[in-house]
Amino acid sequence: MKKTLLLCAFLVGLVSSNVMALTLDEARTQGRVGETFYGYLVALKTDAETEKLVADINAERKASYQQLAKQNNVSVDDIAKLAGQKLVARAKPGEYVQGINGKWVRKF
């Protein structure tokens, strides 16, 4: 329960960051990035701006996952996968997510 509450607080923080969220939202709606079940973004377009955004966000996510894992005595991979499931589930229509089979699909 504690792990879920901490993860929810982390996810709210990700979305509410004014500068990052707007840029991330734009990238999502433009089909430039996609969410995975592993908790990290993937650049679907290989331009420098998109790749930098993905690298920056994934670095922030990894740091948060490491902190949560340490606090809850679980693996970083477990935290990342839990976050990934929630991020994929919360993706809006038109945004890309990677299915369990590894294929990219646009949510509808």
UniProtKB/Swiss-Prot annotation:
Xref: InterPro entries? UCP025560 (IPR008309)
Q: Please provide the record's keywords in A-Z order.
A: Periplasm, Signal
Membrane-crossing residues? none
Protein's cellular compartments: Periplasm
Phenotype upon knockout is: The deletion mutant does not show any growth or outer membrane permeability defects.
Organism's domain of life?
A: Bacteria
Where does the protein principally reside? periplasm
Instruction: Please identify the protein, giving its name as recorded.
Output: Probable chaperone-like protein YdbL
Protein's organism = Escherichia coli (strain K12)
Gene giving rise to this polypeptide: ydbL
